């Protein structure tokens, strides 16, 4: 039976969606095992804001978190709050916003490309995002800056919708405005993205300035006001703003030089190297084995880029609309950003979506060129990516899962809760050097006031603060034969034997061990039981 193009399109859309959702949901919360220090701090602040209306530094509903001392983007924390309210403090809960945004991005990229090309190219773009290692990996854990990938897509989607129904421009402004709270590095480029996209539409007579566009502009300006205030506060031009409903904090250390025009040639070279090698030194971002988009894909990207340049040149010369211009604006401004910062995969996350879209356009072009000579060229290319995807998935859930658990300290959540359950009133829990303090405190119930009153820093002031003690936790501390509870990472069999000879009972949670002296009358009702 011959299926119509419409039915084939729907069937392929469903299959790609199932593939993409499955890759993001399978063993969600378990792989990557453990918790990264950034997602831990974001979750810690979400819990504090949810229950006490302020973060660990005492700021009520800040537009930017103080966190490590040099700050952290806040939107991810606010998105975690309703899920924490519903499901409690668990690693899989912290990762829900990123996973959901990742899945919604599959819908968004297909819809965006379908508006500027045909359905085959749009499904190719969706497919590449669905099976691509970069996007699968970022969707499965909660690094706050990676939210910007989805919000920039949503902003563009509703911008394109706005050409047909102008009220959508307002929704586009909302998502572009929210992107400012996903990742501070995009602050310089998002207003320029909106400006260039708007000027282009006016240039090709695709829109006129109406009340909806004015409202959209004002909406975006409202989102930028806290950002401007934040900059003025941290440049010591204004005092910090603290109210019961909203705060603009003065950071302990303001990294104003993170985005700068210094060393542009070196930064551009680093960006090119990142895109060509498809990896950085961060195992949670990419792997040497599979890269970001599978190693052979960049050939298609270059082709797609050339196709777009040709179409955009014609569009500008004839003053006729072509949606490829939007992709080029976003891509070129991401390149500009890459020349202003020291890149790694997540710092330049705003570039990868457009690389994949150019890749889809390039593949579509090759299929059109060779379809008559090789009728099954589309099947061959699809099979090539599916084989790579299956290989990546096997690697991700076996070798990668084992390796990443060493970085994220798999077992840390149950280990901390167990240690709390074994602790007597007033007793301290000692933590070894291998952990970041946020990985521990995220599973504690230390209130913001208790945190401020008890925290002792080892390097204050600094961009990345470290602490020696907070409430009942003592960090950088190891067993010396005394009674107590200790959290240690990666004990060898020899280590275990030595500690057991000293009288410690050892309870193992994957990579994390809890050591305790045998004591009588241990507490029966525990945080471990409450959380579980």
Q: What residue spans do the PLM features occupy?
A:
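Transmembrane catalytic cores of multi-pass membrane glycosyltransferases
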Residues: 221-270
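Aromatic/acidic, Gly/Pro-rich catalytic loop(s) in extracytoplasmic/lumenal soluble domains
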Residues: 455-532
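Short hydrophobic beta-strand segments
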Residues: 422-434, 482-489
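Short, well-ordered alpha-helical microsegments
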Residues: 359, 437-438, 494-496
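Short extracytoplasmic/periplasmic juxtamembrane "stem" segments immediately C-terminal to an N-terminal membrane anchor
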Residues: 42-49, 246-251, 406-419
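Membrane-proximal, lumen/periplasm-facing interface regions of secretory-pathway glyco-
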Residues: 65, 375-423, 433-448, 452-468, ...
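Membrane-integral, polyisoprenol-dependent glycosyltransferases
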Residues: 2-236, 270-367
């Amino acid at each position: 039976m011959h299926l119509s193009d419409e039915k084939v399109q729907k069937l392929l859309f469903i299959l790609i969606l199932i593939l993409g959702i499955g890759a993001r949901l399978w063993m969600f919360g378990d792989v990557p095992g453990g918790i990264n220090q950034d997602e831990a701090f974001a979750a810690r602040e979400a819990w504090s804001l949810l229950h006490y209306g302020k973060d660990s530094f005492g700021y009520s509903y800040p537009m930017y978190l103080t966190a490590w001392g040099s700050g952290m983007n806040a939107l991810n924390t606010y998105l975690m709050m309703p899920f924490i309210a519903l499901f409690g403090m668990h690693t899989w809960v912290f990762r829900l916003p990123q996973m959901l945004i990742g899945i919604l991005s599959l819908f968004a990229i297909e819809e965006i490309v379908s508006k500027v090309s045909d359905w085959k190219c749009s499904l190719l773009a969706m497919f590449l995002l669905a099976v691509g290692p970069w996007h699968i990996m970022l969707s499965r854990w909660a690094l706050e800056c990676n939210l910007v990938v989805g919000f920039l897509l949503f902003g563009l989607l509703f911008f394109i919708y706005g050409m047909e129904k102008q009220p959508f421009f307002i929704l586009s402004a909302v998502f572009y405005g929210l992107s400012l709270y996903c990742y501070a590095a995009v602050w310089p480029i998002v207003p320029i993205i909106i400006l260039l996209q708007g000027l282009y539409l006016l240039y090709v007579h695709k829109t006129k300035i109406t009340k909806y566009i004015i409202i959209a502009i004002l909406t975006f300006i409202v989102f930028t006001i806290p950002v401007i205030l934040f900059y003025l506060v941290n440049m010591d031009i204004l005092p910090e703003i603290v109210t019961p409903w909203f705060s603009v904090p003065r950071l302990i250390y303001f990294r104003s030089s993170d985005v700068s025009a210094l060393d542009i040639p070196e930064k551009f070279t680093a960006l090119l190297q990142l895109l060509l090698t498809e990896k950085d030194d961060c195992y949670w971002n990419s792997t040497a084995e599979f890269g970001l988009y599978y190693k052979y894909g960049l050939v298609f990207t270059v082709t797609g880029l050339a196709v777009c340049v040709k179409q955009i040149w014609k569009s500008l010369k004839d003053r006729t609309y072509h949606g490829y211009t939007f992709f080029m604006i976003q891509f070129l401004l991401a390149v500009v950003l890459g020349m202003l910062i020291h890149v790694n995969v997540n710092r330049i996350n705003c570039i990868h979506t457009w690389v994949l879209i150019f890749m889809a356009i390039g593949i579509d072009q090759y299929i059109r060129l060779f379809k008559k000579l090789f009728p099954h060229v589309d099947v061959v290319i699809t099979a090539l990516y599916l084989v790579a995807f299956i290989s990546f998935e096997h690697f991700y859930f076996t070798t990668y899962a084992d390796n990443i658990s060493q970085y994220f300290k798999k077992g840390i959540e149950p280990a901390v809760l167990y240690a709390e359950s074994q602790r007597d009133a007033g007793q301290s829990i000692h933590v070894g050097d291998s952990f970041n303090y946020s990985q521990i405190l995220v599973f504690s119930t230390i209130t913001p006031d208790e945190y401020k009153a008890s925290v002792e820093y080892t390097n204050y002031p600094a961009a990345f603060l470290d602490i020696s003690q907070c409430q009942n936790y003592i960090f950088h501390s190891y067993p010396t034969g005394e009674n107590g509870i200790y959290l240690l990472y990666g004990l060898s069999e020899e280590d275990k034997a030595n500690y057991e000879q000293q009288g410690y009972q050892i309870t193992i949670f994957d990579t994390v061990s809890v050591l305790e002296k045998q004591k009588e009358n241990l507490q029966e009702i525990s945080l471990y039981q409450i959380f579980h």
